[in-house]
């Protein structure tokens, strides 16, 4: 574990947790404006479409979306650098997602990008996604550019 963190990711993860999601649930796209978090995500049970948006200052890929399927079956993990918004869609009846983070969650600095922002051009696997009211009221990428500018 220490070798992976120190040599490959060059990160000190200080916090770990699991979360669960049911089928057709989307959570995201979340980030913190201060106390930014680098994350490592993998799936202990089920299958998710994991999606990140680059919000880093002066990044050549600012505003670009990256998607990957993570599942118990494929045993892949995803390192998400600080400065990215993160979200995922759950494909199966029961999904358990495992996180490692290099900074603690602070609700004072939480924000996010709304899932259905057309400028992101995301093709969703379902038209019947379940999205929390909190996540339905996040800002667009254009509002982010005006209000927050970058991470």
Annotate the PLM regions.
Residues 1-76, 94, 99-151:
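Non-catalytic, conserved peripheral segments adjacent to functional cores
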């Amino acid at each position: 574990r220490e070798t992976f963190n120190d040599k490959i990711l060059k990160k000190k993860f200080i916090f770990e947790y699991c979360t669960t999601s049911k089928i057709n649930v989307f959570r995201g796209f979340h980030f913190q404006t201060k106390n930014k978090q680098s994350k490592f995500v993998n799936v202990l049970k089920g299958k998710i479409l994991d999606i990140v948006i680059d919000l880093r200052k002066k990044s050549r890929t600012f505003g670009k979306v990256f998607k990957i399927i993570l599942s118990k079956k494929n045993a892949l993990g995803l390192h998400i650098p600080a400065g990215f918004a993160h979200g995922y869609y759950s494909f199966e009846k029961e999904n358990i997602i495992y996180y490692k983070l290099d900074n603690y969650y602070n609700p004072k600095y939480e924000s996010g990008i709304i899932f259905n922002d057309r400028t992101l051009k995301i093709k969703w696997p379902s038209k019947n996604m379940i999205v929390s009211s909190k996540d339905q009221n996040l800002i667009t990428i254009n509002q982010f550019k005006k209000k927050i500018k970058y991470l």
